[in-house]
Regions:
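Glycine-rich, Lys/Arg-enriched anion-binding loops that position phosphate/diphosphate groups
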Residues: 29-127
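Charged helix-capping and loop-helix junction motifs
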Residues: 18-26, 143
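Single conserved hydrophobic/aromatic residue that forms the stacking wall/gate
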Residues: 1-14
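Short histidine/acidic/glycine/proline-rich micro-motifs that form metal-
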Residues: 12-16, 43-45
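Phosphate/ribose-recognition catalytic cores of enzymes acting on nucleotide-derived substrates
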Residues: 83-198
Length: 198
């Protein structure tokens, strides 16, 4: 059975170099006896919701706005890899997830996040970037401190959701300064999830 219906938005483009418009598709539909429905764009706060705008928000750290447009929390489902385990010595054990090339890259920085483990969600603090203070990574990494969870997660594929952007990634003068900032970010995340659903 061939699908003979298509729905497109007024601003939709297709074909090589996005030259085709929805109205052209309607014309082609009439020619080949395919029902084409042109729908009005979906708006949020007077702005058109589009994949281009969502990607822009993710890249510029406007993650809360991106989430609102998506209708769910932006994130990744990636394997947990071994790191340098420095966080354990600071009482902030973390998981590391390598972000593959080709993915929409969130702005480097620290986020309130949530990690799903065995069907349960745990609040977390996630740094996305290259960890300039500790060890400069060659590829962007998501490093997450998971609150109220203790267990071995190496090799497991876990879903990470970004909820709120806290601050840009930066290089600290010392490990002590970095540790103090992580503690502060943890407090911010606790407050965030006291007011928002995980």
């Amino acid at each position: 059975i061939r699908d003979r219906r298509r729905s497109r938005g007024l601003g939709d483009v297709y074909k090589r170099q996005a030259q085709g418009k929805a109205v052209d598709l309607k014309r082609l539909g009439e020619k080949y006896d395919i029902d084409v429905e042109i729908v009005s764009p979906l708006l949020m706060g007077g702005e058109v919701i589009s994949s281009t705008e969502i990607r822009r928000c993710v890249r510029e750290g406007e993650i809360a706005k991106a989430n609102e447009m998506l209708g769910y929390h932006f994130g990744f489902c990636l394997e947990v890899e071994h790191g340098f385990q420095r966080g354990r010595t600071w009482d902030f054990p973390t998981i590391n997830q390598q972000i593959p090339k080709g993915r929409v890259m969130p702005k480097f920085g620290v986020y309130c996040s949530a990690v799903e483990i065995d069907g349960n969600k745990y609040a977390g603090v996630t740094n996305i970037g290259v960890k300039p203070t500790v060890h400069v990574e060659t590829a962007p990494l998501a490093e997450t401190f998971i609150m109220d969870y203790h267990g071995d997660l190496y090799g497991r594929k876990l879903k990470l959701e970004l909820h709120e952007f806290l601050r840009p990634e930066k290089m600290f003068d010392s490990f002590d300064s970095l540790r103090e900032e992580i503690a502060k970010n943890k407090e911010q995340t606790v407050r965030y999830f006291e007011e928002n659903k995980i």
